Amino acid sequence: MRQQLATAARHAWAVSPLGQGIESYDGLPAEILYDEPHRQLRRYCPETRVPAGRPVLLVPPLAVSTRCYDLRPGQSLAAHLVGSGRATYVIDYGAITFADREMGFEDWIDDILATAIMTANAASGGHGVDVVGWSLGGTMSLLTAASHPRLPIASLTAFGTPFDYTLIPAVQPLLTIDRLLGTRRAMTLTGAMGGVPRHLVRASYRAMAPRRELTKALHLARNILDVEALARTEAIDDFIGSMPGYPGRAYHQLHSRLMARNELAEGTVRLTQDREVRLRDITTRVLLVGSATDNIANGPAVEAGTQVIPGARYVAADGLSHLGLVAGPKAPMLSWPSLDVFLGQ
């Protein structure tokens, strides 16, 4: 009993704001292929095996760090892919500030992702790249593939990428405000701030999982002797704490085009008056993975993509949360196997 009390006290101090944390994880080693503002491309270093097969490019969402793919030991999709013998790349957007307020979807579609795909392809033998995106990272990847069908994209997998925003309960308050005020007025505050600052992004992400936030203290108390449970909670908190902000133009496009007008569900996104991106122009194989228990992009909202992308296939990984689709402790059993099969085809 005395030893348990000592362990509990040590763990309680470690998870407190003054503590050093339960688990120290610096991430997988990686080499930088190029490093420019909002576009750093890294290749994870294999431990022993020589990479074989097509390379994989991991695309994070806007306003999310690359930690989503390398959360911690056992919850790292990047480590899983590297361990399977694939050359694995990740594109990092870095910090987003007020100075970046003019960055829009076009910057990702025409430059950031297109350049990353071509570079990864050239660095790995030129046989095509398997692109994997999570959440809005999947959206940007799909819009890139539709806009540039000649890019060397061998396949595209999107985890938790919503298409029909009318099916997502968490988005409905924003849509109600938009209907009452109109898009221009609804966007006044974010326009003045040059986007969505990182602190607001982090608070919004936490608000979309209220049960987790309300019960976190009780969860920590109940598991104060369980190092693994504490480390998982700590990793998620660190991940949320690393979220950058949304640039103004990109958030305006997200709000007005994807949410308010629900254009992805229609299959055509109108970036400007002169430019439309049609999902039917995607020529590569597409896999959509979703979960009925995802509070941010539930299964039906993700599966709606099969109605607008030619040949797209949907796979359910029910029981996983939004982040859990790519980095949950059950992802190796529920969602990663579908990716492995798809990449092997």
Predicted regions located by residue number:
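Short, surface-exposed "cap/lid" segments of acyl-processing enzymes
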Residues: G19, D26-T97
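Alpha/beta-hydrolase active-site loop
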Residues: E102-A123
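Alpha/beta-hydrolase-fold enzymes
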Residues: A122, G126, S141-R249
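Short beta-strand immediately N-terminal to the catalytic nucleophile in serine-hydrolase-like folds
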Residues: V131-G133, F159, V289
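Gly/Ala-rich beta-loop-alpha elbow adjacent to hydrolase catalytic centers
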Residues: V132-G137, S141
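Short beta-strand/loop motif that positions the catalytic acidic residue
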Residues: I282, L288-G290, D294
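Conserved loop-alpha-helix segment in the C-terminal half of the alpha/beta-hydrolase fold
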Residues: A292-R313
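Catalytic histidine-centered segment of alpha/beta-hydrolase-like enzymes
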Residues: I296-G299, Y314, L320-L334
